[in-house]
Regions:
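Extracellular, repeat-based ectodomains that mediate carbohydrate processing or recognition
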Residues: 1-342, 457
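Extended, charged catalytic domains and RNA/DNA-binding interfaces, predominantly
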Residues: 270-277, 291-640
Length: 640
């Protein structure tokens, strides 16, 4: 670890599982790759730090026997010491951060999920293993920690989340950043002169405005919820990134690098230190020198090309920070108990079917424009969204591509969180194709799917859902935009697909089992009834599903749910139910619906010799039912 040595540390999926790997470049010559984590753990989230000229420590989160734990391993000279578990046996631990100071002060922090909350904890590694100390409040959702060890002291920063309501059925999260300093009496939060511990409110470009009138926002291709700490001769800085324009384009993003100095352990007013790019990162070491510091940020160009720039930022050259107050949101605790419903079941012949609730079109931060850690949103879906089934369908290519690493990592978390008969997180992704509306245009023309979208192209997306064994990611631009090649691979892997959005072209393939009628973005069947009824009138036999399509951290609470009747909560039973259309779509309410024709359950095909059909409906709403409408071939024929 002298000036001639460079170590690169990463996580990788290997045949035996996920491992932490490392490779040394000595005097410009790359050495052999070494495995740092053991085979008994599925290891992710690596970080590393140079402790001295001859010592390096690596930390990661490892899964063993359904538990995520933080482990470290140190390299002393040329000898690797045995791995050591640092987190306790309570909860599941993620995202380690390390900080070392030449005086020997060596700390490790991480976030940990237990009792339905994330919290940030840490321990001193200077002389063995010090006691684990609470850093963030225990009754809030606190995660994504970072750590800085300076002459002014040891500081930790983190993201804090509060569930909020913006009106009936409108659920989101309120994001704030916080900083704490280690003192002789433990960890103490830094405040401003008025005693306010909120260092930053992350509202602009992240959460919709509710009052005085609703103003939505869109995606962003940077790290708008990640705190960064920067050392200064006078104190430290807390930095974060925000979307410059609340309503700005996802495809042409612009971001601000915002900073708030901490002087004499007090928060100073925020300022804007850089503008015009996205995905800001601090160079190592994160240190101001002569009033300047180095950062890295990117531009995003059509076709998914990112170009990163080295920025020399000056803390004395800044512009005022301005941000409107976000009114209309109020705190809540999820799940809202009075909104939960008892498990319903129905009898069909000799079989009993349970009613399970699914959101099968969700996103996390593995999608280029979305928010939320994969582990965090699986917990959210299970514990706050009260889902039985969730599928995170990250886009194969939306502005920038989904890498193979990101796809495999998403599937890893799906399998890590699945507990048959308790909770299912199924692997999959979103086929994000756009096809031309001009007959003479080629399917494979990149202009179909790159901004500003040529050939009057329109979305032809699919939710691709695999069984737990998974399947390949077939990126539409790599197969000439040919959905037949997608269908072939999905069928071979035992998966299914569902249409998405209010524009698509049905493929007619057996793996395409359902249509997304509504989502958090709108009621598609109401917007374009001719599309959906036209498919049915032409003999299409597709299930009705509703999926949140949440890019904003709320799986299960994004305005759309699918009720599925299955014999048990297993992947096999759920996929079979979808193939047989034993399901129904709602706008997010958990209404109980049992519809039958001549005694046959919804989704079944029946024949009748006389042409007479007896329809029965049993329904229980979460609110009093106002109206029921019978529709035949796209026309309303009866209202009850």
């Amino acid at each position: 670890m002298n000036e001639k040595d460079l170590w690169v540390i990463w996580s990788a999926k290997r045949p035996e599982g996920w491992r932490i790997l490392g490779r040394l470049c000595r005097s410009g010559v790359w050495q052999k790759t070494v495995a740092i984590s053991g085979k008994q753990y599925q290891a992710i989230h690596p970080t590393a730090i140079r402790v001295s000229e001859h010592v390096m420590t690596v930390a990661w989160s490892g899964l063993q026997q359904s538990r995520f734990r933080i482990q470290t391993r140190s390299l002393q000279g040329i000898r690797w010491l045995p791995p050591r578990t640092e987190s306790d046996t309570e909860g599941n631990a993620f995202r380690p951060a390390l900080a070392f100071k030449p005086d020997g002060n060596f700390w490790l922090v991480w976030d940990q999920y237990e009792q339905n909350h994330y919290r940030v904890v840490g321990r001193n590694l200077s002389a063995g293993q010090g006691p684990i100390e609470a850093i963030s409040p225990t009754d809030m959702h606190c995660l994504q920690p970072t750590l800085l060890n300076t002459d002014q002291g040891l500081y930790a920063a983190w993201l804090q989340k509060q569930d909020v309501l913006g009106g009936p059925g409108v659920v989101s999260q309120w994001h704030t950043l916080h900083v704490a300093k280690r003192t002789d009496d433990g960890w103490r939060q830094i405040t401003d002169a008025a005693g306010n511990p909120v260092a930053a409110e992350l509202t602009q470009g992240l959460v919709a405005q509710i009052e005085p009138q609703p103003v939505a926002t869109s995606g962003y291709l940077g790290r708008r919820t990640t705190p960064m700490l920067l050392a200064d001769e006078k104190g430290i800085w807390l930095l974060w990134e925000r979307k410059s324009d609340h309503r700005g384009s996802t495809a042409q993003p612009r971001g601000d690098l915002v900073g708030r100095q901490i002087l004499q352990d007090q928060l100073q007013p925020a300022v804007v230190l850089a503008q015009g790019k996205v995905d800001y990162h601090l160079a190592h070491p994160a240190q101001v020198s002569g009033g300047k510091f180095v950062a890295l940020a990117s531009n995003v160009y059509p076709g998914g090309r990112r170009l990163y720039h080295r920025l020399l930022c000056d803390v004395n050259q800044h512009t005022p920070f301005q941000q409107a107050d976000w009114q209309g949101w109020r705190p809540t605790e999820l799940p809202i108990q009075e909104e939960l419903t008892e498990r319903q079941q129905i009898q069909v012949g000799e079989k009993t079917y349970q009613l399970y609730w699914a959101d099968m079109h969700c996103h996390n931060n593995l999608s280029s424009d979305a928010e939320g850690e994969p582990d965090e949103l699986n917990y959210y879906a299970r514990d706050r969204g009260a889902l039985d089934v969730v599928v995170f369908t990250n886009n194969d290519f939306y502005i920038v591509p989904l890498t193979q690493y990101e796809y495999e990592l998403g599937n890893f978390f799906a399998n890590a969180f699945t507990r048959p008969k308790q909770f299912l997180s199924l692997p999959g992704y979103e086929w994000t194709s756009r096809i031309p509306g001009v007959k003479t245009a080629r399917l494979s023309d990149p202009g179909n799917w790159t901004h500003p979208y040529n050939n009057r192209s329109y979305p032809n997306h699919r939710s691709v859902i695999y069984p737990p064994a998974g399947g390949p990611v077939i990126r539409f631009m790599e197969v000439e935009n040919d959905i037949n090649r997608l269908n072939y691979e999905v069928e071979k892997a035992g998966g299914i697909t569902l249409t998405q959005h209010p524009a698509f072209k049905p493929s007619g393939h057996p793996v395409e089992v359902g249509m997304e009628l509504t989502s958090g973005w709108g009621n598609y069947m109401q917007q374009v009834p001719q599309l959906f009824h036209g498919i049915l009138n032409q003999g299409g036999r597709l299930a009705f599903v509703a999926c949140g399509d949440s890019h904003r951290r709320a799986p299960g609470l994004s305005g759309a749910l699918t009720g599925i009747y299955a014999e048990e909560l297993t992947a096999e039973s759920i996929l079979e139910a979808l193939r047989k259309r034993r399901c129904f779509a709602t706008n997010g309410s958990r209404v109980f619906v049992d519809t039958r024709a001549n005694g046959s359950l919804m989704g079944e095909a029946i024949t009748t010799e006389t042409g007479d059909v007896e329809l029965t409906l049993q329904a229980t709403g979460t609110r009093p039912i106002v109206r029921t409408t019978l529709i035949h071939n796209g026309k309303q024929i009866k209202t009850f």
